């Protein structure tokens, strides 16, 4: 595997993370049978205050951004990997980075149906604490069910 460099987000990364989000999010929503709930990153990031997260990282491989994440001290809230780089351990590298920078992270929500993401987080000690129903953040006209995953820090 080629080496992965993870660094803090820079404003010049915006277009690349839009593309990563928009392609990967469609897969995530399809797994949860929520295809019609898609919003492009340019909209979702504003509605969900993405740029207010204190930690936003990007992963670079072969000279291009291939993943991004956003998190607080308690929650890993966003993690998307470029579709062509899924299953290359990049998601794992991003989770490792987040847990190194914010070791108190103990909460993640995963859409029910997104089993690949659930398995990724389980490999880091997260377990399903409950399944919660509500509305999709940033797109409240859609009902969602999420795995509420926790871990001991």
Language model: regions and residue ranges:
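Conserved GNAT-fold acetyl-CoA-binding loop/helix
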Residues: 14, 18-47
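Conserved active-site alpha-helix within GNAT-family acetyltransferase domains
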Residues: 92-93, 113-131, 139-142
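Conserved N-terminal entry element of GNAT/NAT acetyltransferase domains
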Residues: 1-12, 147, 151-153
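A conserved beta-strand-loop-helix scaffold within acyl/acetyltransferase catalytic domains
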Residues: 69-74
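Conserved GNAT acetyl-CoA-binding A-motif
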Residues: 101-113
């Amino acid at each position: 595997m080629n080496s992965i460099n993870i660094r803090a987000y820079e404003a010049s990364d915006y277009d690349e993370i839009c593309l990563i989000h928009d392609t990967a999010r469609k897969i995530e929503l399809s797994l949860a049978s929520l295809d019609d709930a898609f919003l492009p990153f340019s909209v979702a990031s504003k509605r969900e205050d993405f740029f207010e997260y204190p930690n936003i990282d990007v992963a670079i491989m072969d000279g291009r951004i291939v993943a991004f994440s956003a998190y607080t001290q308690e929650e890993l809230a966003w993690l998307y990997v470029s579709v062509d780089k899924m299953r290359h351990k990049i998601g794992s590298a991003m989770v490792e980075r987040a847990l190194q920078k914010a070791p108190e992270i103990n909460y993640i929500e995963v859409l029910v149906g997104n089993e690949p993401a659930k398995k990724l987080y389980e490999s880091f000690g997260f377990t399903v604490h409950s399944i919660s129903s509500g509305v999709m953040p940033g797109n409240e006209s859609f009902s969602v069910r999420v795995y509420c995953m926790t871990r001991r820090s």
